[in-house]
Amino acid sequence: MTTGFLQKIFGSRNQRLVKQYQKTVATINALETQIEKLTDDQLRGKTDEFRQRVAAGESLDKLLPEAFAVCREASRRVLKMRHFDVQMIGGMVLHYGKIAEMRTGEGKTLVATLPVYLNALAGRGVHVVTVNDYLAQRDAEWMARLYNFLGLSVGINLSGMEHDQKQQAYAADITYGTNNEFGFDYLRDNMVYETDARVQRALNFAVVDEVDSILIDEARTPLIISGQAEDHTELYVRMNALPPLLERQIGEEKADGTGVEKPGDYTLDEKARQVFLTESGHEKAERLLAEWGLIGEGESLYAPQNITLMHHVYAALRAHTLFHKDQHYVVQNGEVVIVDEFTGRLMAGRRWSDGLHQAVEAKEHVKIQSENQTLASITFQNYFRMYAKLAGMTGTADTEAYEFNEIYGLETVVIPTNRPPKRIDKQDQIYKTAKERYDAVIRDIRDCYERGQPVLVGTTSIENSELLSHLLKQAGLPHEVLNAKQHEREAAIVAEAGRPKRITIATNMAGRGTDIVLGGNAEKQAAFIEADDSIPADEKARRIQKLHDEWETLHEEVKAAGGLHIIGTERHESRRIDNQLRGRAGRQGDPGSSRFYLSLDDPLLRIFAGDRVRSIMDRLKMPEGEAIEAGIVTRSIESAQRKVEARNFDIRKQLLEYDDVSNDQRKVIYQQRNELLEAHDITETITAMRHGVITEVVRQFVPEGSIEEQWDVPELEEALRNDWQLDLAIQEMVNESSSITAEEILDAVTTAADEQYEAKVAMVGRESFSAFERSVMLQTVDRLWREHLAALDHLRQGIHLRGYAQKNPKQEYKREAFELFAAMLDAIKQEVTRIVMNVQIQSPEQLEEAAEQIEERGGHLENVEYQHADYADAGAPVANVTTAAAAATATADMVGSAMTHGGPGGEMPKVGRNDPCPCGSGKKYKQCHGKLS
C-alpha cells in the first residue's frame, strides 16, 4: 500500500526514466533546425568529426544528442522516415544497455539505427542480432542506405558464407546476423589453428531484436558443434518395437497404495515432459529384450553392461509418448524436422540430443542419422553475457522483466506508444470440449468475414492449424495458412493479412518480422512493380499511384469494420506469446480487437487449471455449446500461466548455474588456446610442462625427501625407457655414490630430458619445431576438451541422485567438475610431453609429415554439424554426446585426433594472473589453472 502511495506521488521507475529521457529529446529537437541546414556532404562529414572527438576521449554519452540529431536528419533524407520522439527515447534506452519494450508497429528497426550509429563511431564494431537470415538480410539492406550515407560500413553475417566474406562482415562498422551464426562463429574461432583464421573481433556492443525470443525462449537450448560418434542405428530400429507393447499407467501410486486408476508399464509426467517405467514395465521390458536376444536371460536392465540399452529404451519411449508428428516435428523429404514450439517455424538442421532424434526417426521409419559427439558448445545466456554492452528490443518484455534483470542484469523500460492504442481485448470464452470451441471460432470468423473485417487466427501447433483449415473449408470460408510448412510464402501472406475479408491462420506469430497493415501492404506490392524492368518508368509511377489510392480506400474500409480481429484458439504456456499474438492488432493507433477461445481439453488447462474450471462449469450446469466468460476463470488461467513461467524460469536459472561451471572452464581453455595461437615461441610452456611431468614420474619411484631403501630404481629406469625414450643408468649412479639424494636423481633425469629435447630442436631448427609443438598442443587441448565435455555431460545426467544421499547436487557437480578439469589439465601436460619426447625426427620434412599426421587424426570428426538442439523441452541433457572411447584409444601412439576444419570466434575476456581463477577453486589464476600457460 505504501509503495502504491509513493508511486502516485513520484511515479514508477519506468515513468521517471522516460521523463528523464524526454529532457534529452528536447535537447535533440533543439538541434534539428541547425542540422537541417547542412548539405549532404556536411551531414556526412559529421561522422568524421564525431570519430575524432571520440578518439580524443569524449564519451559517447556526451555525443548522444548531436549524433541522434544527425542520424534522424539522415534518415529523413535517405529513408524518407523521421524518428518520432518516442523512438528517440527507445534509442536512448538501447544505448544505455537496457531493454526497450515497444509495441508492434512502432518501428523497432528504425529505432535501432540511433544507438547503432552512435556506438559504431567508437570503431569497435556493433552487432545487430535478429532471429533469422531473412530478417538480417532485409534489415541490413534496408538500413545500409542510411549507414553508408553517413560514411559507415555494413556487413551481413549469414550461415553458409565463405570464410573471407565473414571476415569482411565482422570488420565492418556494423554487422547484421542471426543469434545462431554469431554464437557458432565464436565457437569456431576457438577451434582454429591460425590467428588469421578467426573472423570475430572483441565482443563490444550487441542490439538484440526480439530479445525475449533469443534470451529467454532459446536460453535453454545450447549451440552445439558436433562430429559423428559411434553408430547405434540397428539398436534404435529394434528398440522402436518396444513402446507399442507397453501400456500407460493412469494415475500415480500414493504412499498408502492408492491412486492408480489403471495399472500399466509406464507413467507420463506431461508437466516435466518425462516418462518413467513402472516396476511391471521394467519386468516386461527385460522379458521382451531377453526374447529378442538383446540382454541375457534373467539379466537386469540396470546391470553395468546394459546401461546403454536403458538409454535406448527411454529414448524410444519418449519418442512414442511425448513427441507427436505435426506438433513437435514434421517429416519432410524423408527427414524428421523439429518445429519450434514458440514460433511454429521449421528448424531445419537442428536435432534433439541424447539419441531422441534417432528414436523419432526410427518411429517414423525414415533414415536414421548417426549420433554425434560434442566438439564445442555454449548457451546464448553465456554468449551474450560476454558483450561489453548488451541491449535488446521487443514488443513483449515486461512479463519477463525480472528474469532479464536477474540473469543478464538488463533493465526493461516500457516505451510509450506514438499514438494511444485502440485495441479491445475481450474476455476469454471457455468451452467444455474442443469441438464446441472450434464451432464458436468458426461462428466468429464467419461474422467478421461477412462484415469485411480481416481475421488472424493463432494456433499453437501445425496440427491445430491444419484442423482449423479443414473446418474452414467445410464452412466454405476462403483462407490462407501460415505455418512452418509454408515458410517460403510467409512474408507475402503476412503482407496481405490486413485486407478486407482476409482470413489468415498462423502458428505462433513470434518473430515473423512483418507488420500487418490494415488494407494490405501497398509498399510490398509497389516494390514488385519497381523491380520489374519491363515496365516503362511513367507506367510504373501511374500503377504505384493507383495502388496507393486503392490502398487508402481499403484502409478506411477495414478501419470502419473494426480493424484486424485476433482469435486465439488456445492459451500458450507463456503470457508473452499470447501478448505477441494480440499485439498484431491495433498497430500505431489503428482499431483492432482480440479474443481467446479455450476448451478444458487444452494442455494448459488440463494440466494446471482444469479441475477447478470444470467444477465451476459443473456447478453452473452449463448446457452444451455454452461458454464461460468470467474474470475469475481468466484470472485462474493467467495464474496457471504464471506458475508455468515461474517453473520455466527456475529451469533456466538452474541450467545457467550448472552451465556456469563449464562456462568458467571454457573461459580458461579458450584463453590459453588464444595465448598459444598468439605466442611466437612456446618453448617456456613446453619446458615447464616437461619438468612438471618428469618430476611426477620420478616422484612415483623416488619420493621427495626419501632414503635409498624406499626407492624403486629398476622400475623408474623402465618407465623412463618405455614411456619417455630416456635410457639412463640410474642404478649405476646410485651404486657409485654413497650420498646421492632424491633431488639429485630428479636433476639428473630432468637434465637428460632437456638434452634430448635440445638435440631434436637442433636437428630441425627452432622455428620448425616450435610450429610442431604448437600443433601438438592445440590438437591435444582440443581432443581432451571434447572428452571433458562428454565427461561433464555424463556427470550432469546423474548428479541429481546425490540429493538422496543428503548432498547438494549443485555443490557436488561443481566439486567433481573441478576435479575433472584439473585431471584434464594434467592429462594435457602428460600427453603433450609424451608426444614431443617420443617423436623421432631426422629432418624438417619428417617434422612436417608428423604435423600432417596429427591433423589427419581428426578424420572421424570430419562430418561437422551445427545444432541448436532443444534438449530442455525433450527432457534431454545439455550436450548430445556419446562417450568418445574410440577417440581416446586412437591417440596412444603419437597424438590425439584433431579438428579438421578451421573457422570463426571472438576474443575471450582476459583473466589476469592475480585474479581469482574462474574455475571457482578460490586460488589465484597463476597458482591454479594458469600454470598450464
Curated annotation (Swiss-Prot):
SMART domains, per database record: SecA_DEAD (SM00957), SecA_PP_bind (SM00958)
EC number(s) recorded for this UniProt protein: 7.4.2.8
Binding site for ATP: Q87, G105, E106, G107, K108, T109, D515
Residues annotated to bind Zn(2+): C917, C919, C928, H929
Class of enzymatic activity (EC top level): translocase
CC annotations in GO: cell envelope Sec protein transport complex; cytosol; plasma membrane
Cofactor(s) recorded in Swiss-Prot or TrEMBL: Zn(2+)
Signal peptide: none
Cofactor: record remark: May bind 1 zinc ion per subunit.
UniProt xrefs under PROSITE patterns: SECA, SECA_MOTOR_DEAD
Topological category with respect to the lipid bilayer: Peripheral membrane protein
GO BP terms, alphabetized: intracellular protein transmembrane transport; protein import; protein targeting; protein transport by the Sec complex
Keywords, ordered alphabetically: ATP-binding, Cell inner membrane, Cell membrane, Cytoplasm, Membrane, Metal-binding, Nucleotide-binding, Protein transport, Translocase, Translocation, Transport, Zinc
Annotated compartments: Cell inner membrane; Cytoplasm
Catalytic activity: ATP + H2O + cellular proteinSide 1 = ADP + phosphate + cellular proteinSide 2
GO MF terms held by the record: ATP binding; metal ion binding; protein-exporting ATPase activity
Assembly description: Monomer and homodimer. Part of the essential Sec protein translocation apparatus which comprises SecA, SecYEG and auxiliary proteins SecDF-YajC and YidC.
The family this protein is said to belong to: Belongs to the SecA family.
Function summary: Part of the Sec protein translocase complex. Interacts with the SecYEG preprotein conducting channel. Has a central role in coupling the hydrolysis of ATP to the transfer of proteins into and across the cell membrane, serving both as a receptor for the preprotein-SecB complex and as an ATP-driven molecular motor driving the stepwise translocation of polypeptide chains across the membrane.
Stated name of the protein: Protein translocase subunit SecA
Lineage summary: Bacteria, Pseudomonadati, Pseudomonadota, Betaproteobacteria, Burkholderiales
